[in-house]
Structure formats: C-alpha cells, structure tokens
Amino acid sequence: MATTIHPATAPSLDLDRIRADFPILDREVGGNPLTYLDSAATSQKPIQVMDAVDGYYRRSNANVHRGVHQLGNEATDRFEASRVRVAGFIDADPQGLVFVRNTTEALNLVAGSYARELLQKGDRVVLTLMEHHSNLVPWQLAAERAGLQLAFIGLTEDGGLDLSNLDELLAPPTRLLSLTHQSNVLGTVNDIAAITAEAHRRDVLVCLDGAQSVPHMRVSTRELGVDFLAFSGHKMCGPMGSGALWARPELLERMPPFLGGGSMIAKVELERSTWNTVPHKFEAGTPDVASAVGLAAACDYLDEVGMERIHAHEQGLVRHMIDVLDESGATVYGPRDLAIHGGAVSFNVADVHPHDTGTILDRLGIAVRAGHHCCQPLMRELDVPATARASVYLYNTHEEIDRLGEGIAEVRRVFRV
C-alpha cells in the first residue's frame, strides 16, 4: 500500500519572494552561493519565525501558568494560542497536543508512558525496516524493560513496505504499530490511512513518525486516523527545540506522566501526588515558550504559502533530481514513482565514499547529508555502509538541482571514476 499523492494544480511558488524570507540563503560557502539540500536534517528559518521568537522575548517573556502579572498572562496566552495553532495545522484536537523538544522525545514519551507502562509482558509492537533510530531505540528500551516483543515489516525491492504478511503481523499479541509516514532515507511515503484502518480492525493502535511528512504535505490526524503523531518544528521552518506529540486525549488520560515536577501536578503531598489535566500532565517544568511561539509562526508561514503548492513544487524538484542523478551515473535508492516519493533522495557515486562525495560538494557550496542517516538497519538492508542524501524544500530551485549535477561531475573528476 502506498499513498497516492496527486500532483497539485495550484499556481507555482514565487521563489524570489520565498527565498527573500530566508536570509541564510544569501550567504556563500567556499566562494560559491549556498545550495542548501539538507532540509530533511533541518530546514532553514524565515524571518517571520525569527521575528516571532524575537518579539516574544522583547515584549512578553515570562513563565507560564504561574504569575498573576500581565507578562505572565501574556506569555500563557501566547503559549496556549500556539498549542491551538499547531494542533490546527495537523487537523487535531488541541487537548491532545503536548509540546516536546523534537520527534525523538515525542516517540520516547509514547514508548515510555504507553508501551512500557500499559502493555503487558509478551505483547508485541510492530515496526518497519525503514525506521529512523528514534522510532526504533525507544521501543527496544521499552521491550527490554517490560518484556515486550518486537516484529518488523520488511521492504519491497523498490523501497516500499512489504505488506504481504500484514495480517499476520497485526494478529495477537500485537498491540501497537509504530511507523514512519515518510522515510528520511528512501523518500517513500507510506499509505498510512489504509494501514491504520487495517490495524484498527485488529484493535491495534498506530503511532506515526511524521518528522518528514508534516513539513512537506498536508497531514490530517482525522483523515489518517492515527492514535499518536510525533513531529519536529525545526524541520518545518520552526525553531530548534520545538516539536509536538499529538495523541488521542483518552489515551493521554490513561498514560502515566513521562516526567515529574512543576506544572504537571494537581496536588502534591509528601507520600503521593495527583496529576494535572491533559495535555499539561506531560509538560513538566518551564516549557520553551519561545519555541512554541516560533512553531506557531512557522505553521502560519507554511499555510500562507500553501502546503499543496509546496508539495507540488517539491515533486518537480525530486523528478528533476532523480533525472540528474541518473544522468550522472549515480545509484539512486528508493521508489521512482513520484506518487509515493517525498523530498529526500539518497544516492551513491560508485567507488566513492559518500563522505567524500559530501566533502567535494561542500567545497562547491552544496550542502547534502552523508552517512547512515540514523538508519543503520536500513543501510544493512540496502547492503551499503552509507549514502549521500539530497533533500529539498519550498525554497529550493531547479538551478540548484542542476548545480548538484555539476557537483557530481566534479566528484567523478576528482576521484577519476
């Protein structure tokens, strides 16, 4: 099963205007204009987000949910308004939105407070072979501590999920399925709505890693039907240190707190405490209010540009990139069908280590990622130690894709391959 993403018919992006919003794109690297093709690792930030964070610190900085003074009330109002805004971006109930630092923390929260505490010894959690370590290691820890079993959905030859034995994997004792919406290595976009429907038919909950999808396409928790959704702000034009876990409020009610301290309590006695209402039960201590404000501003920015237009723009860039890489003789990993392909493309140049590829490209001002991309089991499945990865976003241009092709030619010249 794979999500069919129909090419959008929306007007093309005004790239000159968009790029003017990202000051870092004006800089040079090694005497060359910066060609930033690493947005799957982190996105660049528009001035609108920087201004929102700066404005909060300049005018409203205070601790939230505590003071009776005006600054405290303003900070609290902005923090809670940001929760509503971010929840709206993913078409979700704000009561289920917990602010966290990143996708990793969100997935650890689910693994620690749901799987480790509420599942029983012998219960099974199903993952896939394309998962980022952040959607693998927390489940390994939960399995070790709670006596859970882990099972894995394999891959097809073209980089999709092999769902031929899904019925078997979802059968008892499986209680939860946790998987990525979009692979950070292969770019594969999985058909989450169909998979979730099948899981729910078996009374299996679904936890979705949306780190690579929420920034790039319209994601609706109601349409996908998932029970948990984790994503990071820094990959979607928001500040580093911003992110969210959305969960069905009734699940958060059942789950014990992840961290203890101020804000997450209702009443504290010497021997025991009771907990605040959700989602505050999972937000111990002073939150990063500025990051929440910045993430809300990023949601505003992306919605103003238009998620459908962003996705259509990225599809055109990815098609161009795959063609350029093919023409250069590079090996490209992942699906060729744009209907199931996101904005990340992994590749290798024969007889050149990806770190060397990345180093040569960097000398030309081209920023790509090189390594295992926090996906060592997937690298073993692909039978490679590492790959180079180029990834696009709303601010990239076709000229930059051509520049990548010229960079690959330089890699071949330097290494005589």
Predicted regions and their residues:
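Pyridoxal 5′-phosphate
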Residues: 1-417
